[in-house]
Curated annotation (Swiss-Prot):
SMART domains: CNX, Connexin_CCC. It comes from Rattus norvegicus. It comes from the Eukaryota. The chain crosses the membrane at residues 21-40, 74-94, 131-151, 185-205. GO terms for molecular function: gap junction channel activity. It is a multi-pass membrane protein. This is Gap junction beta-4 protein. It is found in: Cell membrane; Cell junction, Gap junction. Disulfide bonds join 53-175, 60-169, 64-164. Residues 41-73, 152-184 are extracellular. The gene is Gjb4. Gene3D superfamilies: Gap junction channel protein cysteine-rich domain.
Amino acid sequence: MNWGFLQGILSGVNKYSTALGRIWLSVVFIFRVLVYVVAAEEVWDDEQKDFICNTKQPGCPNVCYDEFFPVSHVRLWALQLILVTCPSLLVVMHVAYREERERKHRLKHGPDAPALYSNLSKKRGGLWWTYLLSLIFKAAVDSGFLYIFHCIYKDYDMPRVVACSVQPCPHTVDCYISRPTEKKVFTYFMVVTAAICILLNLSEVAYLVGKRCMEVFRPRRQKTSRRHQLPDTCPPYVISKGHPQDESTVLTKAGMATVDAGVYP
């Protein structure tokens, strides 16, 4: 499998991600991809060859192995990693589509034409929805594979000995799994890292939705508050007595000097 191509995808989408998205990429690449390539494949390399049953009946070890390991851990993890990282490629493709559209727009209207996008990689409009749906899809894929692992391998356990009575075995035979403790440790490790990735994806979804809601409702709240604030267009005036000879009146603005409204000789 070409893991260099997968690394290129993860590196390309890193510049379009939030802080939580960068943490997710680090967890996927370091704790899942590298561990899978360096260690997991070596641990499960001898899974069928060293699956030994205490019988010489031809075909019995093969059917017993298929009974307890219908799908290999390694192949399930490989499929899971591919499906989890593919949505990140959609984000990169969406940004590339924006760049191509911007290039054609400038070729048609000239280099001084107003830009279609203020920031090509800014998560607005369709790119925001693409990024959000990619997060939901990644969380759903990891959750689905955890459920599949739980159904196939009960409680993610790896027993040392399994009892098999499948045809063509003549009777119930005991079969022994190679390196069960080591395989159990790696299984738990991959399950925990997948759960962490699910938590990071859901946290990023909450962050994006919350930030978007604040951007939408904050201007409305400020506009509503300005409507309720009445301007001081009619300052209060106080009427007081004016000149004692003609009994004129004086208009006095609160806090200011008096203004004589009468007529003086």
